[in-house]
Amino acid sequence: MTLDDAALKSFGFIERPTKNMINIDPLQTGGILTEDARRALVEWGDGYSICDNCGGVLDLIKKPPVQKFIHEALPEFLGVDEVRITHGARESKFAVMHAIAQEGDTVILDGLAHYSSVVAAQRARLEIRKVPHSEKPDYHIDPEAYGTAIEETISETGKAPALALLTYPDGNYGNLADAKKIASVCHEYDVPLLLNCAYSVGRMPVDAKELGVDFIAGSGHKSMASCGPIGVLGVNNDNGDYSDIIFRKSPTNKNKEIELLGCTARSATLMTMIASFPEVVKRTRNWGNEVADARWFSEKLETMGLIQMGQKPHNHDLMFFEAPNLYEISTRVKKGRYFLYKELKSRNIHGIKAGLTKFFKLSTFEVGRENLSYIVDSFDEIIKKYE
Amino acid sequence: MTLDDAALKSFGFIERPTKNMINIDPLQTGGILTEDARRALVEWGDGYSICDNCGGVLDLIKKPPVQKFIHEALPEFLGVDEVRITHGARESKFAVMHAIAQEGDTVILDGLAHYSSVVAAQRARLEIRKVPHSEKPDYHIDPEAYGTAIEETISETGKAPALALLTYPDGNYGNLADAKKIASVCHEYDVPLLLNCAYSVGRMPVDAKELGVDFIAGSGHKSMASCGPIGVLGVNNDNGDYSDIIFRKSPTNKNKEIELLGCTARSATLMTMIASFPEVVKRTRNWGNEVADARWFSEKLETMGLIQMGQKPHNHDLMFFEAPNLYEISTRVKKGRYFLYKELKSRNIHGIKAGLTKFFKLSTFEVGRENLSYIVDSFDEIIKKYE
């Protein structure tokens, strides 16, 4: 590509095609900015804006109140001893794995783990052992299976796993496994547990000390109404001096934390997280209503012949549906498997991946009962249209 | 901290204290958003907005034109074979080091390397050998010294360094070392060279193939008028199949690149980079005028008794000054070493770190001759005021 004026016209400002649509993509519902965050975005949009008054350590900046946010508010919010900001949940997971494990060590992942947990372990050059889950429709994870996986690792490698990880909830079915029990099983073998809370921190209450987990990875862009990429990493030192290991400082650059490469998310990403924080805290207190909305929505779709997979009644806004009737329609209509996407799009609804009909996931988080009713009615209309 | 209403009032929307000031902090001048980027910021601010139409690989998204940007425009812009987006220059450097070196290998860094290069090497568990530079006032790096450092590494460890790195320009003096000659010296020993272009890509023309370097790390928030954190990583395969190594895919998740943890900078950060790109390309073509502005500014300050360190005449907007007269004033005035910061602040000028008087750096990039004249006059006024 020659970078002449004609070629450069492909870039510049570009509109977001889904703007103003009702978005039920699980990736999107928890990351919609609050009004305060929208203002912060413009205010702090310039590259390094947050560094205007930095003395050399991002998380100790006093103006704006980064220090207060990271060292006082977030530890309370997550129920941990220490927090740092990262570029996202996957970067939080990699940082923990890379810091506490040696190359070749084993990490235990739940069988429903997000691909980024797998890839983080591969980047850290660790062996992966998965904890199995039950089959369709429950996809249940038995806490005792963590013990089995740990014992198998010890018997096969002669060494305990360096870490165990649980996806809470998992990103396919929205199942919330018994984290407290799993932490307790892992701790019987002195294996620390990392909770991947990309879909929970910022949506629902999560407290590491209450659950007894050692590390929490959260996602700002997924669940904390923040402009991405940004995440949080919380460390609970109840079972070891973990924060000393993970946040160890450079021997040559004494105020720079090695695992964070000195500093991480800055400016608009961090300032939108700070801007949304009051509302994010408050919305986690409203979690009961969100779960009620999810259950109501699930019941409505099931009356139309769709089947919700995973825990039932469901405990999270992320839900996976099997839709044999929509699949059947797709086999005989002109637009084929794209018909559902197009029908929903024509009704201003986005978020079920184009081409999916038989299985798909969606999220009801903060969509609100009115829009959820509209979506339910839309499914009803679409199904009746092709019957 | 109890997260009650009173505590939460510390957060929410916060104003940027330096808004509307003339900012000459080298961190800030190249990261100021263009108008298109400011619009993109609002349009794409929601967490995962860019993923609306993602098929599983960030850099292959067609709508918005991410694929065209990363696979066509940026390779041309950087003079490389492959480009990926990262969270910043430091993350680009770590990705290269972590992917191509083994733990315990040596990396050669220029003696003026940014701390983040040091910390990236420490995170990758590499040994660091520094190439010395000449002393004050030039801080010159002799290309042949890279050969010496490589030979010393081989003789001491029995193994060639895995990588050499040059900071181009360095972040203290704004010196542009002879990258082409250094690349040639490194290649005599088959050692690849990474150019840290955090202060060059997006400000001035940089072409990896022309310079013969193997890797380029650039910074969106520092020099490409982007909302941070975001960076670029360019790979030139002329001397090895480096992109196959660095962008290797997961054996289990076949379309996910391990070293990037699947995907990196998303949404507003990437969309502001795309939005600013046409203007960024054009401004690099105006680099001659920026250098002329820097030289003019340097000469003006030198007539007042300040001394510019580093290359002279200077070749970059980032400049380091020694100011014995301002230091002398600081020893006898009431506000002590904060007097300069306060005097400049009262004149709406920000960017020289609070408390510095004897040595400081600044940047003239895109400040414009009118504002530069105003800054020159302000220094003149301040010096005369305390004489």
From Swiss-Prot, chains A, B:
Keywords: Protein biosynthesis, Pyridoxal phosphate, Transferase. Transmembrane segments: none annotated. The modification N6-(pyridoxal phosphate)lysine is found at residue 222. One of its GO terms (biological process) is translation. It comes from the Archaea. InterPro entries: PyrdxlP-dep_Trfase, PyrdxlP-dep_Trfase_major, PyrdxlP-dep_Trfase_small, Sep_Cys-tRNA_synth_arc, SepSecS/SepCysS. The keyword Aminoacyl-tRNA synthetase does not apply. Pyridoxal 5'-phosphate binds at residues 89-90, 196, 219-221. GO terms for molecular function: Sep-tRNA:Cys-tRNA synthase activity. Its EC number is 2.5.1.73. The keyword Protein biosynthesis applies. Homodimer. Interacts with SepRS. Belongs to the SepCysS family. PANTHER family: CYSTEINE DESULFURASE (PTHR43586), O-PHOSPHO-L-SERYL-TRNA:CYS-TRNA SYNTHASE (PTHR43586:SF3). Converts O-phospho-L-seryl-tRNA(Cys) (Sep-tRNA(Cys)) to L-cysteinyl-tRNA(Cys) (Cys-tRNA(Cys)). This is O-phospho-L-seryl-tRNA:Cys-tRNA synthase 2. It comes from Methanococcoides burtonii (strain DSM 6242 / NBRC 107633 / OCM 468 / ACE-M).
